[in-house]
């Protein structure tokens, strides 16, 4: 209040300003009164072409109601007003900000994103208490030097502007913790960036950078660095010393090799897809003990080293669209791996139908091949019992050796009784009835309830889940993709051990409510349905949920509270009709999407 009181004085031009303001959308006096009490004013999305003068002078002019109300009630003590500390002017039609912004010296947050600003007032430099400035999604071509005087600024959001250069003294903003410069026209970064030692998140995505300054390694607090979609051919070797780095995004550049990061012991996510990387070697991997996400899709990688098994915390590995012809069978020993993408590779030792069975089936197969690989490393792997020879009716070898009952790709409408009879004295743990013409789940599946833990009914014509299936109390994996399901029975709640369920390519219009109560679920695949909404509060209760695939549904909005589901490591939302988060945010990966959603939660 002190700063505002010192500036409080009569305004001889008030009459002229008031007349001009009558031509602009009015700001309700109720909002102004509330802002004087709370210190916060939200004018987002009001169609403002300019900021009314009485907003800038909110703490200077005597409120009009003070002349009309002489009761001096406790609720009307206008002289006890609070200095404005938070001003939101987002999503209007502002072309400029007045220099009168200096009349709000107590501001800690100023949000002017999504306007049409082409410049910023030099008076911003006088807001010495400012901690967060959001001027993203405007048309800014430069930043005033005075902005560098904001020594307490912690968050500066400049994404989606037209900046081609930054002031050399940018490093003066020593308190910065978050800096977003994505989607501009930057060709270089000032060397003074090295002084930003408190920076935690730096986003340089979608610019025109050809290299990064070696001095960037001085940012010892940096946890997230996003250089997606630039022209980088390499990264400085000094990057390897950034010990705090947790997320590194290098997608859509011109890299020919992965950087070696021996000191990045905390790195959890490395995204380097859509580059020109040809070699993945042990040196790239051996120090990354904390890595949970490795994304290398759309490169030219020819082989995967056995050292991939050093990444024991890896949960997501994306190697799609490379030149890989053979996988090391030891890949099956990555016990935490929940998602493995291999499509678009010329794999000779893995059949396509096996790839379609999902990550867990593939890992299981790779583990089963480890001993054979040691015994005859130069031989092509023989046909295994994972698929049955077409002339074989029931594969007893698969039943007795692999505990697998496989009657897939027979195009039958009913599973013959002798198939179930074959396993009476040989309990199986896996059942594969996929790619048939089944319209219902076989009732005799209940006979397997004491042993089976993995069931595949994918690619049939099943319209409902039977109660018999709900008795399989040991079930951990259930695949019912590509059927005609519209709902799930509440009795499925009894499947208390179920970890993975695949419901993709069905006809669900609502998210099956029973899934919210199946708290052991780690993976829900529900892509290519017609789901219109989700309940983030219920999802947050699912503390084991790590993967949620809702691609190609009918979601009109993504609830911001979904960002609080911090156990999610893979969240796929592409192909829905919602407008936010935008595609550029989705492309950054799950962590960025969740962070964006959290930032949208009303406070």
Curated annotation (Swiss-Prot):
LRR repeat extents: 83-104, 106-127, 129-150, 152-173, 175-196, 198-219, 221-242, 244-265, 266-286, 290-311, 313-335, 336-357, 401-422, 427-449, 451-473, 474-495, 497-518, 520-541, 544-565, 567-588
Gene3D superfamilies reported in the protein's UniProt record: Ribonuclease Inhibitor (3.80.10.10)
Record PROSITE patterns: LRR
Pfam family, one: LRR_14
Keywords, alphabetical: Leucine-rich repeat, Repeat
Segments of this protein annotated with the region Disordered: 1-27
Keyword Manganese: no
Entry-linked SUPFAM superfamilies: L domain-like (SSF52058)
PANTHER family: PTHR48051, RAS SUPPRESSOR PROTEIN 1 (PTHR48051:SF1)
The protein's name in its UniProt record: Leucine-rich repeat-containing protein 40
Organism (species): Gallus gallus (Chicken)
């Amino acid at each position: 209040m002190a700063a505002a009181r010192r500036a409080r004085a009569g305004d001889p031009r008030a009459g002229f300003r008031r007349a001009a303001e009558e031509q602009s959308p009015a700001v309700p006096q109720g909002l102004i009164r509330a802002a004087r009490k709370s210190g916060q004013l939200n004018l987002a999305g009001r169609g403002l072409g300019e900021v009314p003068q009485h907003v800038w002078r909110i703490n200077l002019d005597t409120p009009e109601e003070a002349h009309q109300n002489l009761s001096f009630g406790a609720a009307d003590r206008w002289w006890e007003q609070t200095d404005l500390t938070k001003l939101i002017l987002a999503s209007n039609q502002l072309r400029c900000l007045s220099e009168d912004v200096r009349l709000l010296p107590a501001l800690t947050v100023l949000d002017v994103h999504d306007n049409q600003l082409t410049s910023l007032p030099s008076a911003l430099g006088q807001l010495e208490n400012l901690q967060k400035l959001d001027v993203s999604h405007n048309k800014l071509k430069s930043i005033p030097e005075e902005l560098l005087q904001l020594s307490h600024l912690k968050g500066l959001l400049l994404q989606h502007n037209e900046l081609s250069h930054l002031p050399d003294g940018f490093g003066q903003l020593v308190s910065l913790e978050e800096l977003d410069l994505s989607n501009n026209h930057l060709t270089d970064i000032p060397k003074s960036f090295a002084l930003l030692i408190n920076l935690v998140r730096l986003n340089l995505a979608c610019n025109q950078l050809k290299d990064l300054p070696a001095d960037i390694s001085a940012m010892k607090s940096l946890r997230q660095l996003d250089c997606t979609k630039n022209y980088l051919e390499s990264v400085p070797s000094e990057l390897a010393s950034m010990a705090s780095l947790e997320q590194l995004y290098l997608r859509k550049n011109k890299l020919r090799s992965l950087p070696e990061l021996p000191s990045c012991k905390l790195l959890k996510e490395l995204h380097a897809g859509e580059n020109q990387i040809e070699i993945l070697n042990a040196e790239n991997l051996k120090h990354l003990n904390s890595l949970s996400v490795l994304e290398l899709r759309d490169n030219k990688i020819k082989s995967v080293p056995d050292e991939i098994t050093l990444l024991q915390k890896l949960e997501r590995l994306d190697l799609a669209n490379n030149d890989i012809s053979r996988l090391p069978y030891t890949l099956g020993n990555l016990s935490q791996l929940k998602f493995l993408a291999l499509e678009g590779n010329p794999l000779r030792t893995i059949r396509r139908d096996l790839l379609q069975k999902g990550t867990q089936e593939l890992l299981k197969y790779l583990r089963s091949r480890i001993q054979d690989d040691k015994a005859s490393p130069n031989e092509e792997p023989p046909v295994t019992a994972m698929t049955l020879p077409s002339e074989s009716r029931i594969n007893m070898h698969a039943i007795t050796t692999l505990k697998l009952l496989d009657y897939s790709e027979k195009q039958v409408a009913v599973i013959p009784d002798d198939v179930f009879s074959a396993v009476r004295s040989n309990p199986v743990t896996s059942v594969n009835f996929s790619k048939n013409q089944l319209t219902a789940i076989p009732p005799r599946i209940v006979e397997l309830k004491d042993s089976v833990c993995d069931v595949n009914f994918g690619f049939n014509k099943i319209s409902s889940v039977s109660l018999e299936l709900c008795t399989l109390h040991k079930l951990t994996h259930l695949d019912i993709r590509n059927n005609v399901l519209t709902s799930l029975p509440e009795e499925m709640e009894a499947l208390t051990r179920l970890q993975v369920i695949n419901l993709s390519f069905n006809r669900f219009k609502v998210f099956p409510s029973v899934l919210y109560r199946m708290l052991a679920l780690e993976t829900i695949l529900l892509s290519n349905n017609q789901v219109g909404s989700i309940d983030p509060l219920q999802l947050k209760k699912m503390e084991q949920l790590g993967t949620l695939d809702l691609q190609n549904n009918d979601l009109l909005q993504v609830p911001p509270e979904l960002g609080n589901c911090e156990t999610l490591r893979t969240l796929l939302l592409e192909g829905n009709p919602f407008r936010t988060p935008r595609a550029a945010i989705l492309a950054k990966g799950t962590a960025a999407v969740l962070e964006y959603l959290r930032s949208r939660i009303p406070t």
